[in-house]
From Swiss-Prot:
GO terms for biological process: glutathione metabolic process. It comes from the Eukaryota. Homodimer. It comes from Manduca sexta. Its EC number is 2.5.1.18. It is an enzyme of class 2 (transferase). This is Glutathione S-transferase 1. Pfam families: GST_C, GST_N_3. It catalyses: RX + glutathione = an S-substituted glutathione + a halide anion + H(+). InterPro entries: Glutathione-S-Trfase_C-like (IPR010987), Glutathione-S-Trfase_C_sf (IPR036282), Glutathione_S-Trfase (IPR040079), Glutathione_S-Trfase_N (IPR004045), GST_C (IPR004046), Thioredoxin-like_sf (IPR036249). Belongs to the GST superfamily. Theta family. The lineage of its organism: Eukaryota, Metazoa, Ecdysozoa, Arthropoda, Hexapoda. Residues 1-83 form the GST N-terminal domain. Conjugation of reduced glutathione to a wide number of exogenous and endogenous hydrophobic electrophiles.
Length: 217
């Protein structure tokens, strides 16, 4: 059966999964757009599959899984030719997992907290406390980047998930100052040169940027 990804291109977590699919060269994936602005994610059909009514949602045969980090690990474990994107070595995987939890626990909440009031609640400026959380995320990421990539010398799903969030934060909410965050700035530039980023992250990031710009005063 064909694998199906329910997604929204403007969504950073959905873009992360699309980058993983691209990196793994998984063929025959059906993409179904879910319009959050119109409430498509709240339909009975969708909430039966995902009670949390979030995107992305992956359907692989009769298996359903949501949350971009869980999907990323599943895809690499099942379809990866090797474990380079999600190492099986316990110590290496622990670092990757920590960075994934950093994205889900620090980066994405700061991103969502900034964008949700503007996109869905009619606010016309970012909340100052949310901007501070974005900067705190940058502070942590700068300290984590002691190697070429987010979790060491190998490009992993940690980079994919974190860059989906950080690129959006940089382009829309708080630009990354290369003098304050030289390592983070250099890492983001490296990520932006990758084919998976250009194909599956940049276009959706532009859509998100345009959407937010239309809402801000």
């Amino acid at each position: 059966m064909v694998m199906t990804l329910y997604k929204l291109d403007a969504s950073p977590p959905a873009r992360a999964v699309m980058m993983v699919i691209e990196a793994l060269k998984i063929p025959d994936v059906e993409y179904i757009d879910v319009n959050l602005l119109e409430g498509s994610h709240l339909s009975e059909e969708f909430t039966k599959m995902n009670p949390q009514h979030t995107v992305p949602l992956l359907k692989d045969d009769d298996f359903l899984v949501w949350d971009s980090h869980a999907i990323a690990g599943y895809l690499v474990s099942k379809y990866g030719a090797d474990d380079s994107l999600y190492p099986t070595d316990p110590k290496k995987r622990a670092i990757v997992d920590q960075r994934l939890h950093f994205d889900s626990g620090i980066l994405f909440p700061a991103l969502r907290g900034s964008l949700e009031p503007v996109i869905f609640w009619g606010e016309t400026a970012f909340r100052p406390e949310c901007l501070e959380k974005v900067r705190k995320g940058y502070d942590f990421a700068e300290k984590f980047l002691t190697s070429t990539w987010m979790a060491g010398e190998e490009f992993t799903v940690a980079d994919i998930c974190c860059v989906a969030s950080i690129s959006t934060m940089n382009d829309i909410i708080v630009p990354i100052d290369e003098n304050t965050y030289p390592k983070l700035s250099a890492w983001l530039e490296r990520c932006s040169q990758l084919d998976v980023y250009k194909k599956k992250n940049a276009p959706g990031n532009d859509l998100c940027k345009d959407l937010v710009a239309s809402k801000l005063s």
